[in-house]
């Protein structure tokens, strides 16, 4: 598929503290956060003018699902726009709390684990053709996804009985299956629940729940861009070496616990290979595939360049070469500088605090944004485009139809209901339009519905 629909869903961790102590329960904080949303949307589950969905997920985690995007750079922009929307809710919630005499700071963390060991996710969505063999897709994809954390892990200080260790991925400890239809109970690598949000005869939605949430725009670009290239190769029938893992769940933890990428994992064939070797295999295939097919877009070239350079840097143990572009490396360097300066072990509570503060989405407070201000975080999006993305949908996908419909209905104060595929006016006629093609950004039926308001 040369043109693909992408979407990202990020759940955020939430807390409210006063002088270091927890002030409100997550449920209470979430209520304050969503008060403004509920006041205009009459619900804590709403679609926005930019085509995105914002809602309160299980366990009081705010979740933002980007609108449908058909290129990875735009996806990164819209994911960051979601961050900004939530930052706005955070500022609003703090103001309301102070007005009610409750002193405290509200924090939203774009990470995947809390101090109690709970995990919440970053889900990636890729539209794939229905006619392909899904089991073959999963077989080729799983070794890639298990080792992909070397490219796009968010990094984590993991407390173990033998002291704290730095891991590549936050999510790796919480994955229990390879392929499954559950997302919370068993946490698979690929979720098979078949909800295409599109014409089910033509498409299915590949739902990857193994990845970490990313603060870094370049890491996000690499994560989704490399996965897209692997999918394109599978769809084109590219012959791949069998890299099936003997035990993907053990392997994902082994890879996460080794920042050198050299630790060998067992393959089903009885051979052993390191995460670097597995990734190198996919990378070289992707380079060859793009050359043979003449795939030469700026995004693809940037993805391939960063993918190769990341593998080279890890192999050479020269992480400075990717020190502004890969989340787990950026955080690791930050922690190592701090530890050296204050002569601390990895187990020190201050180190855990810095680990968390990297993911604080408040731009005046979060450590990732401190790096960005200092020019130590490479960019993909720009601030103007991100600001636009808060209210303007992508113009080349179905999200445009949804966003335009919502904008018009709100301006006309009309009661409406929308989801990913339906647009409905709640009037006597109950007029509804079903939009099954996520690639279509122009539709006479929708225009008629909008014009009739």
UniProtKB/Swiss-Prot annotation:
Binding positions for ATP per the UniProt entry: 53, 66, 420
A Pfam family hit: Pup_ligase
Residues reported in the UniProt entry to bind Mg(2+): 9, 55, 63
Catalytic activity: ATP + [prokaryotic ubiquitin-like protein]-L-glutamate + [protein]-L-lysine = ADP + phosphate + N(6)-([prokaryotic ubiquitin-like protein]-gamma-L-glutamyl)-[protein]-L-lysine
Single GO MF annotation: ligase activity, forming carbon-nitrogen bonds
Top enzyme category: ligase
Pathway(s) where this gene product acts: Protein degradation; proteasomal Pup-dependent pathway; Protein modification; protein pupylation
Active site: 57
A Gene Ontology biological process term: modification-dependent protein catabolic process
Keywords assigned by UniProt, alphabetized: ATP-binding, Ligase, Magnesium, Metal-binding, Nucleotide-binding, Ubl conjugation pathway
NCBIfam families tied to this protein: pupylate_PafA
Additional observations: The reaction mechanism probably proceeds via the activation of Pup by phosphorylation of its C-terminal glutamate, which is then subject to nucleophilic attack by the substrate lysine, resulting in an isopeptide bond and the release of phosphate as a good leaving group.
Protein name as annotated: Pup--protein ligase
Species name: Streptomyces coelicolor (strain ATCC BAA-471 / A3(2) / M145)
